[in-house]
């Protein structure tokens, strides 16, 4: 969607250390990104940097932009473009800053701000995983199409976004799709994010290996798991597997509401061959009744798209046919419920960029 659109949207990768400014047209980045220090501890300098960065991008364009759209860390009132609250990486915003209205007043074009989980999911739903799966199904001769998607980002935190039939679920308070504060399977009094994040991987590796090296990064732990670096290989693998299990528990709860495909991105997704099997296994878990009867925790069969055999099973299913009573008319009967879990093909940054572009254009059309 929007691949052939000629409108230009300015966008921003808002990090606590640097801002990276760019412009998108037809789902593609059309300028060399402009990188500037974010000056996040000084509001006046930070706002001046935002203006300078967008000005630099605008000067390189042959057509004026129609909007500005980007992800920015919360807490925030995204609908009204106000950023405020406990933002560790943007301390100067804690009292509340009308960032969207500030930029809109300065440039005279609409400004749309969302969280990265939402824009990741939106990008994957419109231009990534969702259309890819539907193309694969069509190629196999199936007329079924998926319309719903749960996007998950694994990194500093446990991010998520939900798209229902091409519409982003933001909720009445801008909290739609959040999973980070779901109950933690292993530590029920804690947030799920405490076991699904960079800090979780580091903590679990320390606990299992007994190595109290605060400088170890998830990349180091991954390389230990791969045998590239010395260390406790079993503990390294287990640290990613535990993250997958804990993420799966929270995702299962979300899927009972969303019922759609799951796509995973973010910095930790590089360890997906350790994370996904544990995650999918958790989605296939069972729950019991007092009578002893067992039920799957999800009504849908779950397939790991990254596993070749699983992917073939997901794509290779046959509809049954049933007769309308009293007639010879046959109708297709879809007696199987199934979803797939996969990794982002383009990566989180690209999907967030495309999500920001699509979100701006969709809002302009409202």
Where are the language model's segments positioned?
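Glycine-rich phosphate-binding loop and adjoining helix at the ATP-binding site
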Residues: 39, 44, 48, 64, ...
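Adenine-nucleotide phosphate-binding core of ATP-dependent small-molecule kinases
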Residues: 35, 39-66, 188, 202-275, ...
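Glycine-rich phosphate-binding/hydrolytic loop that grips phosphoryl groups
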Residues: 114-127, 274, 281-366
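Short beta-strand scaffold segments in enzyme catalytic cores
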Residues: 19-24, 151-153, 158-163
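Glycine-rich phosphate-binding loop plus the immediately following alpha-helix
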Residues: 113-117, 129, 171-219, 361-365
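Short glycine-rich, Thr/Ser-proximal phosphate-binding strand/loop in the N-terminal lobe
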Residues: 2-52, 56-63, 82-86, 173-188
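Short glycine-aspartate micro-motif
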Residues: 9-13, 65-69, 149-153, 263
């Amino acid at each position: 969607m929007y691949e052939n659109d000629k409108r230009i949207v300015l966008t921003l990768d808002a990090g606590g250390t640097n801002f990276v400014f760019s412009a998108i047209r037809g789902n593609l980045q059309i300028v060399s990104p402009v990188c500037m220090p974010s000056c996040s501890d000084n509001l006046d300098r930070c706002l001046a940097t935002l203006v300078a960065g967008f000005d630099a991008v605008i000067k390189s364009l042959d057509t004026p932009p129609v909007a500005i759209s980007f992800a920015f860390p919360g807490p925030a009132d995204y609908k009204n473009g106000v950023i405020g609250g406990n933002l560790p990486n943007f301390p100067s915003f804690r009292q509340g800053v009308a960032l969207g209205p500030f930029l809109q007043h300065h440039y005279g074009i609409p400004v749309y701000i969302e969280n990265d989980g939402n824009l990741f999911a939106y990008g994957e739903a419109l231009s990534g995983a969702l259309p890819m799966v539907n193309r694969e199904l069509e190629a196999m001769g199936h007329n079924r199409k998926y319309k719903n998607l749960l996007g998950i980002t694994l990194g500093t935190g446990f991010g998520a976004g939900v798209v229902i039939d091409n519409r982003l679920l933001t909720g009445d308070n801008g909290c739609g799709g959040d999973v980070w504060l779901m109950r933690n399977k292993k530590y029920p009094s804690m947030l799920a994010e405490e076991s699904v994040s960079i800090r979780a991987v580091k903590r679990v590796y320390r606990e299992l290996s007994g190595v109290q090296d605060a400088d170890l990064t998830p990349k180091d732990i991954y390389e230990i798991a791969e045998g590239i670096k010395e260390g406790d290989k079993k503990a390294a693998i287990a640290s990613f597997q535990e993250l997958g299990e804990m993420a799966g528990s929270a995702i299962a709860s979300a899927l009972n509401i969303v019922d759609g495909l799951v796509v995973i991105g973010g910095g930790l997704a590089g360890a997906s061959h350790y994370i996904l099997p544990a995650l999918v296994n958790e989605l296939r878990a069972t729950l019991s009744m007092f009578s002893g009867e067992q039920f799957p925790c999800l009504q849908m069969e779950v397939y790991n798209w990254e596993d070749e055999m699983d992917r073939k099973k997901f794509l290779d299913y046959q509809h049954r046919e049933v007769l309308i009573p009293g007639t010879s008319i046959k109708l297709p009967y879809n007696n199987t419920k199934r979803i797939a879990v996969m990794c982002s093909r383009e990566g989180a940054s690209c999907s967030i960029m495309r999500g920001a572009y699509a979100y701006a254009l969709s809002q302009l059309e409202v």
